[in-house]
């Protein structure tokens, strides 16, 4: 199976740009910039994660802007990367900064992306999830149930994993009312 990798580089204008490269049968292919990422990016783009449901059918996520201001997702179908897009609906949740931190695909065109964002009420950090169904990304929503737990406004979602049957789980940490970090997991089915 071709296994993509993600990374970053500094271009001639001293801006961070993101790239992907695929390995197949022990040989690495040419690194490419995901289409559309340069148009989104005002500098400092980086990939956070990549996940493949099958060879040539992958998704990647990360952040772009100054400094890492907005989250993006991109999908590869049959070996061709589609255009990188801002995570749909994320701008409605965030007041300032957002980052897509992890993506996982259950099957081609069916993925989940998670991350965190600073909301407009005092810069508190919250968690979001966005789901891709049949190749179309839905709007990002706040992770259900996380808001009341996160009384001090410090969420970090580190990972999401989706099984082939379509069930996903995500985990991370939040800051409780005593200023202690606590772990959490959340699951989604269907």
Located regions from the model:
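Residue-level hotspots at or immediately adjacent to binding/recognition sites across diverse folds
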Residues: 1-190
């Amino acid at each position: 199976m071709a296994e993509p990798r993600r990374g970053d580089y500094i271009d001639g204008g001293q801006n961070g740009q993101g790239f992907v490269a695929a390995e197949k049968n022990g040989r690495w292919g040419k690194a490419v910039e995901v289409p559309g990422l340069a148009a989104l990016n005002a500098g400092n783009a980086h990939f956070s994660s990549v996940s493949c449901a099958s060879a040539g059918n992958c998704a990647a996520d990360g952040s772009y802007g100054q400094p890492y201001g907005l989250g993006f997702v991109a999908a590869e179908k049959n070996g061709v990367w589609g255009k990188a897009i801002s995570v749909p609906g994320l701008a409605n949740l965030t007041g300032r900064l957002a980052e897509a931190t992890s993506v996982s695909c259950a099957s081609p065109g069916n993925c989940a992306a998670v991350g965190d964002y600073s909301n407009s009420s005092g810069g508190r950090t919250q968690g979001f999830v966005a789901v891709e169904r049949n190749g179309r990304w839905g709007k990002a929503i706040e992770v259900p149930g996380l808001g009341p737990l996160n009384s001090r406004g410090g969420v970090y979602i580190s990972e999401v994993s989706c099984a082939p049957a379509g069930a996903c789980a995500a985990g991370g940490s939040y800051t409780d009312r005593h200023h202690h970090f606590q772990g959490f997991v959340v699951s989604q089915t269907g």
